[in-house]
Amino acid sequence: MAKWVPALLLRRVPLFSLRFRPASSTFLPVLAATEPAVSVPSGDLSMPVKTRAEGEDDGFGEAGDPRRLLERPWRFRGCLPGKGNRDVGFEGTEGPTSTRPEWVWSCRCCLGCRASTRERVTSPVRAAGPQPRFTDRETEAAAGTLAHMGFAPPTSFSHFTDQELRDCSSLECLGVVEGDPHVLCSTLSLSRPSPSATLTLLLASSCLLAPAPPSFILLLFTLIAPDLPHS
């Protein structure tokens, strides 16, 4: 393990082509339980997302209005883990249909960076429900990134189970999205998702690019390295 851990500490691995795409249906329940309610000020796209206080008018109509935001949508923080250049931000509207509106935001910066621009998404958004998890191109990009880091990647990532996807969703919300490596490390220790799901989550996030103590990275790979094939 000593031969590749130092490389992780010194090397900034480009992750812009690796995207992790769990089904929308696995994300919404987790987000609803962990993220505070937010709203977007209309008119000025440069303004940051703010937390909406209890009972505050969010500018999208009364409760039940199809334009209204989810009570607890995903907080926009730039490049969200696993979203890449795809649409990010708000996951739906309040009501029985849970449809995603046209005014969701799209991140146009590379995967893993901390800054971004925002613009309205005019194209239709994918419907909720099971989705293809990885395209051939994404699998190839993920395999290349793993090989660059010294691992022999699996030939396909389509073998992930629904439980593994749910594990990744939970880990993203609890650790990576908050940018706290200690929280992520504790979550990994408790939930113990499969090594392949854990590694893919980490590569698809900005976790390894953010400042992290060496002890965190060592413990992190202690959890997943025993079951990983090496090239």
Curated annotation (Swiss-Prot):
Transmembrane segments: 201-225
InterPro entries, sorted: BBLN_eukaryota
Main location: membrane
Signal peptide annotation: 1-25
GO annotation, cellular component aspect: membrane
Record key words, sorted: Membrane, Signal, Transmembrane, Transmembrane helix
Record has Lipid metabolism as a keyword: no
Ranges of the Extracellular topological domain: 26-200
Cellular compartments annotated: Membrane
Annotated membrane topology: Single-pass type I membrane protein
Disordered as annotated region, ranges: 39-64
Cytoplasmic side: 226-231
Top-level taxon of origin: Eukaryota
KW Signal (keyword) present: yes
The protein's name in its UniProt record: Putative uncharacterized protein FLJ37218
Source organism of this protein record: Homo sapiens
